Amino acid sequence: MATIVSGFLVPHDPIMFVAPDAPAKDIADKAWGAYETCAVHLADLDVDTVIIIGNDHYMLFGTTCLPQYCIATGDLDGPLDQMPGLKRQLIPNDEALATHIATHGHADGFDWAVARSFTTDHSFSIPFQKIVQRASEIKGKEIKAIPVYLASAVDPFLSMQRSQQLGQAIAKAVKAFKGDERIAVIGSGGISHWVGTKESGTVNEDFDREILAYCLSLDEASIMALSDERILSEGGNGAMELRNFVCAMAAVEADSSELIEYQPVPEWVTGLGFVELKKNPTKS
């Protein structure tokens, strides 16, 4: 069977690429360095495939189709919203595992939307290029990736409970896969940030540290207990992406965790948190 061996919770902040020199150099260096640390740790894990759980930003899915959750099972490229330092490119997909996750889910009460050809946005491509692709370079082998997109940025939002259940379904499907792949899962999202509102540029460090404390104690329940009203008020509309974190945490079933970095960066409009979700090797 395939095995999920680790996971990461990371941001996908496009302003880092558009305005890389906006914050003080030491702050910027810590944020970019956190991606490199994640890449080094991922390379050390010797994984074959990474499942990246992100969300659309009204770029890939429009008013005609807003899936609650979608998995890409075929040809991949991206990001659609390419920017300096994040160029559009072909992406190696683990088509067999992605198809299995969708098929297994359909038989188990999870009605996946399936994309047999897919172009990603920055929520996938930032962690892919900065962590997965970089780990491939360090390791000297190709690491494949599977995009999973949740409705966590555009309403109607996927519920927190269903986000957790979907992560559990991913874990169950991976365990049932007839292969010996080593898998990692990345939950891609910001903590506090306001997108397209007058509050844009505000970072609520207290809220961020509360969320990171829940992540570090592997406390999905406390994140799930946050009402959408509180998230929107204290974390902004961008913090609805916490659903991505919950889904990833449920999929990884970690034994411990480590804070790699946290920086509140108003110049990049968000709180940047990086957490590694670790599994006991004897259990993986």
Label every model-predicted segment.
Residues 189, 194-199:
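Divalent-metal (often Zn2+) His-rich catalytic cores of metallo-beta-lactamase-fold enzymes
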Residues 12-13, 55-57:
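Glycine-rich His-Gly loop
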Residues 56-58, 191-192:
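Catalytic metal-binding/acid-base residues of hydrolase active sites
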Residues 1-48, 63-165, 176, 198-284:
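Flexible, D/E/H-enriched segments
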Residues 155, 168-183:
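Non-transmembrane, aqueous-exposed alpha-helical and coiled segments at domain scale
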Residues 48-54, 148, 181-189:
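Beta-strand elements within well-structured catalytic alpha/beta cores of enzymes
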